[in-house]
Amino acid sequence: MNSITRRVLLGCALLAIFAVGVVIGQNKFGQPKSVLHIVTVKWKEGTTDAQKQKAIDGIKTMASKYDGIKNVWLKPLKVQGTDAVMVMEFKDEAALKAYVDTPAQKEWYEVYIPIRGQSQTHDITN
């Protein structure tokens, strides 16, 4: 192989490596059709830490019983004006609608509703 051919092949290889690096380094994001169900809550006066934890743990239990919930987020890093934030990711809007009044939701409400002072719910999707 002559030196010009080697240089051309080396140049092509370097160009390919550079192109792969550019593709890997691109900021990619998606717009999934899942639904984030976000609940902010202020607990009733006198609610114990054990009661709060039972309500939060109840979300994990509910997610294990209802197939429409993909993920949960239960550990807020910053909370303003409320005591807790809980997030459930539903597979899609139909899964969120089907969740209402399920046995899993009713079971969780038995723990959550008695200690809930105020709450706001936000549902977000694409």
Report each predicted region and the residues it spans.
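Short alpha-helical segments used as structural interaction elements across diverse proteins
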Residues: 3-4, 34, 49, 113
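Hydrophobic alpha-helical segments, especially transmembrane helices
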Residues: 7-8, 53, 98, 106
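Short S/T/G/P-rich N-terminal loop/turn motif that feeds into the first structured element of a domain
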Residues: 17-84, 91-101, 123-126
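Conserved catalytic core of Hanks-type protein kinase domains
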Residues: 89-90, 115
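Short, exposed beta-strand-loop hairpins at the edges of beta-sheets
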Residues: 97-100, 107-113
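C-terminal partner/receptor-binding element of secreted or periplasmic proteins
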Residues: 114-122, 126
